[in-house]
């Protein structure tokens, strides 16, 4: 057996480690309203996002073009011009651009798709 074939065999065995494959989950919705401050209000209710991890493995895609990482509360402490997803209280998920208008800066309107992946 050549050296390359032996190496390829090791790679193959490593890829069959039980539990190595991770199942991706997602929630799909859309922007239903733009607030007076430019936040993008979605139709994704707290019952849908309640069990979503609040870590960097969670990604939110808006209008198939803009992405942010993680879910935050209203007390987020993120720097200016950071796009964040706020999942807090009884309100639906909203996308917020710190100290600016997400709708204007991203060019997103009601009807745009929103997807949470983790």
Model-identified regions with their sequence ranges:
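Anionic-ligand-binding alpha/beta catalytic cores of soluble enzymes and soluble regulatory domains
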Residues: 1-44, 48-54
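Short small/polar-residue motifs
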Residues: 26-30, 79-84, 112
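A conserved acidic, glycine/proline-rich C-terminal tail/linker
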Residues: 43-107
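Surface-exposed interaction regions enriched in Ser/Thr/Asp/Glu
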Residues: 112-118
């Amino acid at each position: 057996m050549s050296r390359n074939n032996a190496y390829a065999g090791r790679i193959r065995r490593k890829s069959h480690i039980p539990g190595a494959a991770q199942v991706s989950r997602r929630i799909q919705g859309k922007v239903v309203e733009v607030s007076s401050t430019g936040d993008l209000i979605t139709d994704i209710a707290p019952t849908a996002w309640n069990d979503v991890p609040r870590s960097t493995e969670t990604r939110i895609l808006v209008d198939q073009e803009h992405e942010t990482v993680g879910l935050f509360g209203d007390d987020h402490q993120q720097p200016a011009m950071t796009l964040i997803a706020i999942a807090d209280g009884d309100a639906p998920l909203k996308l917020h651009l710190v100290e600016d208008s997400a709708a204007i800066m991203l060019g997103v309107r009601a009807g745009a798709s929103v997807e949470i992946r983790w």
